[in-house]
Each structure stands twice: as C-alpha cells, then as structure tokens.
Amino acid sequence: MKSDIEIAQSVALQPITDIVKKVGIDGDDIELYGKYKAKLSFEKMKAVEANEPGKLLLVTAINPTPAGEGKSTMSIGLADALNQMGKKTMLALREPSLGPVMGIKGGAAGGGYAQVLPMEDINLHFTGDMHAITTANNALSALIDNHLQQGNDLGIDPRRIIWKRVLDLNDRALRQVIVGLGSPVNGVPREDGFDITVASEIMAILCLATDLKDLKKRLADIVVAYTYDRKPVYVRDLKVEGALTLILKDAIKPNLVQTIYGTPALIHGGPFANIAHGCNSVLATSTALRLADYTVTEAGFGADLGAEKFLNIKVPNLPKAPDAIVIVATLRALKMHGGVAKSDLAAENCEAVRLGFANLKRHVENMRQFKVPVVVAINEFVADTEAEIATLKALCEEIKVPVELASVWANGAEGGLALAKTAVRVIDQEAADYKRLYSDEDTLEEKVINIVTQIYGGKAVQFGPKAKTQLKQFAEFGWDKLPVCMAKTQYSFSDNPSLLGAPTDFDITIREFVPKTGAGFIVGLTGDVMTMPGLPKVPAAMAMDVAENGTALGLF
C-alpha cells in the first residue's frame, strides 16, 4: 500500500470554495489561503448562531501505545462514512504541532485513505495559527521583562514569574534558561524556560474563546507572576491584552479544509491532552454543529485525559454535549495492556486481549458516568487475527456496548460504514442525558479527588507541600471554583506510565498546581509530565526532505 503522503499527493483536491458549499458556506463567508485552505469569517459564525445544533459525536480512545491508536484517522473515516450515508457531516479536529511532527509522529492529519488535505500544509505551517500563538505568548514575555527593566511599577518579583516563553518544536535544551545576561542594558537576569507552543495558556484560551471580545477578556485574566508580597499579577495590570488580541485576530478564525472524500473539515487549535485540555476550538465545534446535521470531533490521548476534559471543561462552553462517544481500541494496545512486550504485539494472543480488555472496560464505564451512549470502534490493523477480533467483540457484548470493526485507514469511507450506521442507530435509540462529573462549587481538592477516584480508578490523592500551600492560596484568590485540568501521562490511568491495564490500588501525587485563569482552569501537575518535550533518538525529521519541484517527502 502507498504511504500516507503518496496517497495524499495522488488526490485531486477540489477548490475549498466548492467544498464549503456542501454546508451552506458561500465564497463571501471565507478568507482564502490559496485554493485549498480558508478561514471562516466572524460574520458567518455570527449568522449561524441561532441555528439548532446538530448531532455531536466525540471520538476518544483507550490508553495508547506510543504510536497512537488512530483517533484522528477514525474521526475522519467516520465523518466520510456518515457523508456517504447521505448525512450532512463536518469534521472538527485539532491542528498538528510541528514539534511532534518533526519528533515521533511525522504527521497528524489522519492516515491511509482517511486523511485531511492538503496534509503537507496542515502538518507544517498551515495558516500560521501556531506562529501567531507563539508570537503572542513571547510578546507577553518580552513585555514582562521590559516592565522589570523600566522600573517595575507593579512590584513583580522576578523569582515568581510563572509565564514562560514558547516554541513550536521539541527542544529539551530550552526547558530551563537564564535571560537578561550580559549587562544591565540587556534586562534583569532571571530564570526562565520554554514550553512547547501547544502547552501555552494562549493556545487553551484560543480554543475556549467564543469571540474576539471573550478572547480579549480571557487574555486580560492571565496570571503571569506574583508581586513581592505574593499577590497575583494579571495581563490586565500590564495593560497589554489589546495588543495580544490584535496579534491573534486572524488566528481565532477556524480553518477550513477537506478530507480525501471531500468532507468539509474545520481544523483549529491544538492543545495537548496530557498537559492541557486536548480539544479543538469551541468556535470550530460550535460552528460545525450549526452548519451540519452531524459533527465528528476528537479529544486527545485516552478517554481518561482528552474525553474527561472535553466533558468537564469544553462542554460547558458548547451549545450541547455529545450525543454519543466512540472509543477507539486496537488489538495491539489491548495486548500491550495485557502484558505483551512491544516486540511480540504482532503475534496472535487472545488471552492477552482478554487481560487487556480491562483497560477498555474502564474507559467505557467512565464515559457512561457522563450519561452519554458509548460505541467501541476496533481500528483494524493488518496483524489482527479473526480469533482476536472475535474475542474482543464477545467481551464487548458481555458489557453490552455496541462494537464495530473499522478499516478506514485501508478502505476509507467504506471501511467506516458499519461504525457510522451503528453510531447513528445508537443516537436515534438512546438519548444522551449529559451529567458533569463535578460542580464548579466543589473545591479544587474535591475536584481532583473526584477525577482520580471516579475516572482513573485510584485509591487516594497525595498533595505535595507546594500543592497544599497553593490550595489555600488559590482559594483566597477566588480560583478554587475553576475546573481542574490534570497533567498526567497518557499511557496509564495512574501517574506511572509503566502501570498498564486497569490498576486500582494506587495513589496519585499532585506536586504543583498551575493557574490558567485566562483559560478558566487550574492545571494539576503529576508525575514527570514535561511541558517541553524532547526529540527521540531517531527523529521523524531525519526522513523528511523536499523534491526539486517543491513536493514534500517523508511526512506520514
């Protein structure tokens, strides 16, 4: 079979002006970035606000292997299949970060015959959103350092600046740096550091803002530092929220592209789910819901991370909750959770599938807590055997969850038809009655304990010395009513990435909280989760090149 990029480059793309007509978007409603990419205008988003929202399908997954289990690919294939069934459907996905593209992933625009196009553009600079977010973030850093240099009227303690610089690359050498060295004219020396752009609070804000006014308010509410007497300093104190909004005025508009099958797709925003809330923008999802009968969206990593945050953090900002949740599972990942070594995952092992099923079962039970119907999608791989597939289907039947085999990577829309039909049937027969896991009125401590015990299956939560102090401080500042966004490994329900399956007798330690008051949540840091990733021993970048005619090579 051809590689992802070979398949993508063999497709005759339709002009984006033709694609968007399928969902009632005219040429005057979009701002073109070439022939095949566009941004949706504020006027069109405003015009459809009164429309009744369509059905919403959330795609999530079990705890993944390092290669991922194919949520984006499944989302794309499912949307294409729904369209093939005659359902007016849109996709609402995140846009890739260059860091993982150059690092371990090599691309994040789907795969095989379930891709969004033009995949080279989407994986690289796209419409410049990532660069705008990076620039806004680093402009704020520069303005903070300038405030220190110009007299520090706010009394900012340079030792307690919590705002970091960012870069849309994996670069471990920049995790901790010292700025302002050389001479007094170079600024006030202090410790600083870089996060990856998708970990920036500005990325989260862009993805939760409902319009420019809301964007500006959220930017003003960012906490950047503390004063010498330990009081928080906000962006509004620096009076630069207007400038930051100006930098982001185009980046906030959702991007329109197409799938291989011509399904309209809104690709916008890209926060990671292990260090942020892991969902595409509220604007993209809300607009898709008002333009289409069915919207397919996804949340990053496993359901314990992305889906939990989608349901607890994003849904309160949407016109509606999901009508159904699709949990993607692969036999290779289930075997890994069943104790099989990575080198042996290709060998048939039905017993390991049975053991690893505990991971999928917990995710199904967790999603059912939110009172939303669940469907399991088996993402088919070449090495899967009939016996393993039959074993998994039988296990799903035991817990009464609908399950379908999907081969969208190999067969595109046709490979997702059975899943699409089952999803539609479930939505028609079983109405969702969304229930949030916790209340805003719960304390931060109660919210964390709720997530750890109800979603992760943990026994208890340990709060480190710094976290204990912050619980008191944040309550004094009025931040304790915000949702919690857990920063945790994606590979396990616990904070130990090697503890696979469905562990129960474990504690999770919160070492620190990070206020993201502009985004509207508090991040709880667990384990060794890094907000600036490093590159692997053999980065995907080493296989990338460009042909003499400008064609991209090596993306996948």
Curated annotation (Swiss-Prot):
It catalyses: (6S)-5,6,7,8-tetrahydrofolate + formate + ATP = (6R)-10-formyltetrahydrofolate + ADP + phosphate. The gene is fhs1. This is Formate--tetrahydrofolate ligase 1. HAMAP family: FTHFS (MF_01543). ATP binds at T65, P66, A67, G68, E69, G70, K71, S72. GO terms for molecular function: ATP binding; formate-tetrahydrofolate ligase activity. Keywords: ATP-binding, Ligase, Nucleotide-binding, One-carbon metabolism. It comes from the Bacteria. Belongs to the formate--tetrahydrofolate ligase family. InterPro entries: Formate_THF_ligase, Formate_THF_ligase_CS, P-loop_NTPase. GO terms for biological process: tetrahydrofolate interconversion. Pathway: One-carbon metabolism; tetrahydrofolate interconversion. Its EC number is 6.3.4.3.
